[in-house]
């Protein structure tokens, strides 16, 4: 880490702030003048700057060229502003598009916003500055109907090509009951099948050269090595991959749209299913972002409990990843060993939360209930068991010469490429950048734990899988500290917006009982504002960007997932490799399609 973010961390997480003291605001004013843009106070923890459409490319290029540049486009998406009532001080807009940039050198973020009128939904593409903007712009076009001029291939991404309408617009229905009954006729079926045909010319690909013809191969969407409903079309010259086109969206469920029709509390179970292996890790950024809106500071016991559950799920996910990677390379046995170890984790999770994969256990202001008797014994037994088992995975499989031969030097990329494609997690740390949100931007008390951030230097498949092994060791260190230093105290915050409030108080205070009734029946009312929270999830950085319009439901829920960025990177990495290398590369990414498609 370079420039400290101590100032930001000392501020109350829920304090509305315009961040005018951030150095980048001064740099922008010096370059473009004080009247060139407006700054929006939010609870996102970063400067939010509205710029004119005509200045967008120039401003983004300027941020990339600063002495400590903003080198990563972390996120890009839109918002339908037409029904938003709390817009005081903001530029007039029917729609808006935001660009979230990260500077690794500064350890700081900035968000740029552009206001758009409904009759003129056009923006210049930023793909020439940030190549990973490609999918984000396609998705924004798909879900909002905003056109990005100059985009190399502006087509739908998550929805089928035959889809009518743009689902994240406010005038688009949110429930199936608002649509006419669906009927799949033979004609519709033929139309859908025709739309799935791959035409190389649409993607700028040649069918052949003067000397040879290329073969086009569909890998997926139901191939065992594609790790879910994921299709990737390969342009092949024999076994060599000339180019490829990833095709996503088969697992899309409209998770962000669902956030607009669920209360702040009732949306928690949906967060578990964004990345279905991460469990409570997925709940963390959502509840932290909501707590920023509400102004809730949770007790120390809650922070440590949340960290404990998150690290258990991190180990659980990493074990599945390591074993399936080994399986993709050709060894079967480790998968069965891993499921034995994962069962021990599920026993702890079930004892604590009552559920296994999808606990939906974190609450706004705390957790659902206190730790049960005997939780410490279960955790202690696991901590005694797991280190030796982890050593056996390394010795028996990961040090195997065949596995090394299939993965060392395969699908390698450097730090510059990783940042350009928005790569996070082990994929970024394998290139030598030790960016881990738990260390660089601690949340939920991670600053009180001692652990290391493992890194590597080759950026290949083998580095990525070995980093996950080391991350498990660090998670075990964190769990040891949770076991030894679990604070006493309540498991929920004493705050009016804690949902649901502590039950014992509802039996003693009529005000709390009324509050409980309103929160359960209608949902808590959050102050109008915007908040943001990123966490180090199992597969990289996961974040929630929430917009409240002062109601019981989110006005806009934006979910940024790591797997989405990692799959977009595939063509740039795998060109010139063999098909067999692609299988190993896919296994090394660590993704699930629910995390990609949401």
Swiss-Prot record:
Which segments carry the region annotation NADH dehydrogenase I subunit D? 213-598
Which UniProt keywords are listed?
Cell inner membrane, Cell membrane, Membrane, Multifunctional enzyme, NAD, Quinone, Translocase, Transport, Ubiquinone
Q: Which Gene3D superfamilies match?
A: Cytochrome-c3 Hydrogenase, chain B, NADH:ubiquinone oxidoreductase, 30kDa subunit
| Catalytic activity as recorded in UniProt | a quinone + NADH + 5 H(+)(in) = a quinol + NAD(+) + 4 H(+)(out)
Which top-level group of life is the source organism from? Bacteria
Asked if the Swiss-Prot or TrEMBL record annotates the protein with the keyword Zinc, the reply is: no
Q: Name one Pfam family in it.
A: Complex1_49kDa
User: Which segments carry the region annotation NADH dehydrogenase I subunit C?
Assistant: 1-189
Enzyme Commission number(s) of this protein:
7.1.1.-
Q: Which GO terms describe its molecular function?
A: NAD binding; NADH dehydrogenase (ubiquinone) activity; NADH:ubiquinone reductase (non-electrogenic) activity; quinone binding
* Class of the enzyme per the UniProt entry, highest EC level: translocase
Kindly give the InterPro entries that the UniProt entry links to this protein. Answer: NADH_DH_suC, NADH_DH_suCD, NADH_Q_OxRdtase_suD, NADH_quin_OxRdtase_su_C/D-like, NADH_UbQ_OxRdtase_30kDa_su, NADH_UbQ_OxRdtase_49kDa_CS, NDH1_su_D/H, NiFe-Hase_large
Q: Does the keyword Cell inner membrane apply?
A: yes
Family note: In the N-terminal section; belongs to the complex I 30 kDa subunit family.
Complex and partners: NDH-1 is composed of 13 different subunits. Subunits NuoB, CD, E, F, and G constitute the peripheral sector of the complex.
The protein, known as: NADH-quinone oxidoreductase subunit C/D
């Amino acid at each position: 880490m370079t420039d400290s973010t101590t100032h930001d961390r000392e501020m109350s997480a829920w304090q509305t702030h315009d961040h005018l003291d951030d150095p980048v605001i001064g740099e922008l004013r010096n370059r473009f003048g004080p009247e060139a843009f407006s700054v929006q106070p939010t609870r996102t923890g970063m400067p939010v700057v509205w710029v004119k459409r005509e200045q967008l490319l120039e401003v983004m290029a300027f941020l990339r060229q600063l002495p400590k540049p903003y080198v990563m486009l972390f996120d890009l998406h839109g918002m339908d502003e037409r029904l938003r009532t709390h817009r005081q001080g903001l530029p007039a807009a029917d729609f808006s598009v935001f660009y979230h940039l990260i500077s690794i050198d500064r350890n700081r973020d900035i968000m740029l916003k552009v206001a758009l009128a409904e009759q003129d939904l056009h923006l210049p593409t930023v793909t020439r500055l940030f190549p990973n903007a490609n999918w984000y712009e396609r998705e924004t076009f798909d879900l909002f109907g905003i056109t990005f001029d100059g985009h190399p291939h502006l087509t739908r991404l998550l929805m089928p090509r035959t889809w009518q309408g743009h689902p994240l617009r406010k005038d688009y229905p949110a429930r199936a009951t608002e649509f006419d009954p669906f009927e799949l006729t033979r004609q519709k079926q033929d139309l859908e099948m025709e739309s799935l045909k791959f035409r190389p010319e649409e993607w700028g690909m040649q069918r052949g050269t003067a000397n040879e013809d290329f073969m086009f191969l569909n890998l997926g969407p139901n191939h065992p090595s594609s790790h879910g409903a994921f299709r990737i079309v390969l342009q092949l010259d024999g076994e060599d991959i000339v180019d490829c086109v990833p095709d996503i969206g088969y697992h899309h469920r409209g998770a962000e749209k669902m956030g607009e029709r669920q209360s702040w509390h009732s949306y928690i179970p949906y967060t578990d299913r964004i990345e279905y292996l991460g469990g409570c890790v997925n709940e963390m950024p959502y509840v932290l972002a909501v707590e920023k809106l509400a102004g809730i500071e949770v007790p120390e016991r809650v922070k440590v409990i949340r960290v404990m559950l998150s690290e258990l799920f991190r180990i659980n996910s990493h074990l599945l990843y390591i074993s399936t990677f080994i399986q993709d390379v050709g060894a079967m046995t480790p998968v069965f060993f891993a499921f034995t170890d994962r069962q021990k984790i599920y026993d702890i999770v079930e004892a604590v939360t009552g559920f296994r994969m999808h606990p939906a256990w974190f609450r706004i202001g705390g957790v659902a209930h206190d730790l049960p008797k005997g939780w410490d014994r279960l955790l202690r037994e696991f901590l005694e068991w797991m280190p030796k088992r982890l050593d056996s995975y390394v010795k028996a499989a990961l040090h195997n010469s065949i596995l090394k031969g299939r993965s060392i030097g395969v699908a390698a990329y450097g730090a510059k490429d990783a940042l350009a494609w928005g790569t996070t997690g082990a994929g970024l740390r394998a290139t030598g950048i030790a960016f881990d949100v738990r260390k660089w931007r601690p949340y939920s008390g991670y600053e009180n734990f001692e652990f290391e951030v493992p890194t590597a230097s080759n950026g290949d498949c083998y580095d990525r899988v070995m980093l996950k092994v080391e991350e498990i060791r660090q998670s075990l260190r964190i769990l040891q500290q949770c076991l030894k230093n679990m604070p006493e105290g309540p498991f929920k915050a004493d705050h009016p917006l804690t949902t649901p409030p502590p039950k014992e108080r509802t039996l003693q205070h009529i005000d709390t009982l009324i509050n409980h009734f309103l929160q359960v029946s209608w949902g808590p009312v959050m102050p109008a504002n915007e908040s943001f929270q990123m966490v180090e999830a199992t597969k990289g950085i996961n974040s929630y960007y929430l917009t409240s319009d002062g109601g019981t439901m989110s006005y806009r829920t934006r979910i940024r997932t790591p797997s989405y960025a990692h799959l977009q990177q595939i063509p740039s990495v795998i060109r010139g490799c063999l098909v067999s290398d692609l299988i190993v590369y896919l296994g090394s990414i660590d993704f699930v399609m629910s995390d990609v498609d949401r």
